[in-house]
Amino acid sequence: MQTVLSDQHQLHFPKGELAGGQLVRPYECPERWDYIVRRLDQVGLSDRIEPTALDLSLVEQVHTPAFLQFLSEAWDQWSAEGFDGEAIPTVFPARRMQQREPKYIDGRLGYYAMAMETAITSGTWEAAQSSAAVAQTAQNLVSDGASSAFALCRPPGHHAGADLYGGYCFLNNAAIAATGFLNRGAERVAVLDVDFHHGNGTQDIFYQRDDVMFLSLHGAPEDAFPHFLGYTDETGARQGEGFNVNYPLPPGTLYAEWFKALQDALKKIAAYSPDALVISLGVDTFKNDPISFFKLESDDFSDYGKAIAELNMPTLFVMEGGYAVEEIGINTVNVLTGFLDG
């Protein structure tokens, strides 16, 4: 299995995140990438390549032109106002307010953001494009005949909607990869999101389509970010009715219960019979993750990697979350080695 990665991820390095009423060091940090690379080397998965140039036309199939323009100019507009800190939204278009994009940067940030924890810095746009290029390049490896590949994306992407950023995400790498598979001849693609947090952005992008099935195992939205999507009655709309499947699970969920949901998802994927499978790989289901509440052990990640392999489908792993930094390498690579041994 080849890994695609880029050290340009370091260009996105926010210094602060609002959590618990305090400004803290962001949980989504460059060290996450370092620990994963180190563990890949330790187990011998050292076949790595840099991404090719990003095909922006592919990104434009996933995100709206206005949103992409905003991301490309947000930092320059913010800094032109003389602000010294990172660009963080402070006002949002709440219920019964106009859904019109303002001109002033503070309003634009709130218009496109879903939460306050995700800062834009001087290098965010470049890092987000590089992360998308990592996903695109890995997708092309699989489209060209590789049985599997790992896109070590940072920043992550599954919370980014067609015109929405937040949850540490700017461009939806998994959705870009799924769209790339379709462009390369796939008739159907499944996206399985095993991150602790619901992949609201991916659901948003494909909700009315039947050529991409989206399935997500996540903390119940009553208790877990992003709170406002991820319920079982969200099953798709129009042409996409029946092709969106959510598995919200309660606080304290152990692996046995989580794995039952995974088995059901895998059965649905097998019945759908996609030409390619994208795994939104978040390992924040780990018991010691600081912003999650599932109880998976490190060995459990190996076990479910094997279960995914039993589908025997061309499979692309796209890195998402995981914030127990010292264990992120072990847990991520356990999924990959479990898959390869399956």
Write out the residue ranges for each language-model feature.
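HDAC/HDAC-like amidohydrolase catalytic core signature
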Residues: M1-L192, H197-G342
